Amino acid sequence: MRTSSLLTLALVFVACEQEYDIINEPVDVDPADVTECDFTQVESSDFFAYDCNPVFQGTGEAWSGDIGSIGFHTTQVSGHPFYQMWYTAEATSGAAYELGYAISPDGTTWDTHPANPFMRATPGAWDQDAMDAIQVLWDEDESLYVMTYQGYTLPTSDFDPGQWGIGIATSDDGIRWGKHPANPVIDFNDPSLSLTISPCWPLTITKRAGSYISYVGASVPPDPFFGGEPRCDVYTAVGNGLASWSFASNPALTAGDWYDAAGILAADIVEFDGQFYMFYIGFESWTPTGNGGVITATSPHVAMATSPDGSFWTKWPGNPLPLSGEISPSPSAIGAEVVGSRVHLWVNDYYDSIQENAVGYFLFDPNREEA
């Protein structure tokens, strides 16, 4: 089975080139001072929901349909936060997917790039059917954006395993991307890998002490006689560059509570107030898709874990997190960015009010007082 801010900031796209200065000075702006709507505390917690969610939905771009996976990054432009979003969407061109790019001065109002889309599915490629679970890292050492994603070609029968793996794409401007020639850099069908670990999908990527660290949902191989469904725990893989990865032998975070009984579907990690925070989406169970033994994650919930060093994690006792006000929530992707004294969160979820997937905006702000 396989698993599938105070200054009005004008940011102008010109000929696909960057027209801004990046600085490294910290900034601390209360988002409620610069956004159209306020934030409301969620159930006496340290989380606050934007009152005008969702902030990003079907963009109306001619090329795109429903929003799929999302990735975020924040930099400083003239002392103020500048938000970047990358997103995959169903393509009206007939391609399985295409990649779009949008920017925002406040995290809520987004301008899509006029030259979207920038990457699309290539027929016959190993990743022709999907580009899911995207995460974007800005590598300061190399002055390079690094994107990880799950790609696959779906099986055509019960005897066809399809092709599954983790792909890498890089960009020097966040707009023009090139896929790594060694893709998939982690091949889920690699027999030597499947003896010890069975990857589910990529979760997020960081860089510490000069090494890339990828967090991957993975399980132990199923029993050869009795089979069974995988449980996608969180494992780390250290990269020797971007093409060669070595997995840890033990999980960094183990699923298995009721809200993540079957595993972790998506995650993002930030360093905040002296420790690491993982914001993740766990799920309760699997559902067969009827397509060549492929199963899909169902009954998802947003949760959180902490770690002193990013190696091993402790789940938040208040899990799951109440970061959805919808009747039938179905969170599928999450992005986290530290700006000043708070963590900004974006969650891709199903919104009953518009009957489609869209991105909601939240704050994790332990020092904020509700008026």
Identify what each model region corresponds to.
Residues 13-15:
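C-terminal motif of bacterial Sec signal peptides marking the signal peptidase cleavage site
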Residues 22-371:
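Carbohydrate-active catalytic/glycan-binding domains of CAZyme proteins
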Residues 1-9:
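Sec-dependent signal peptide recognition
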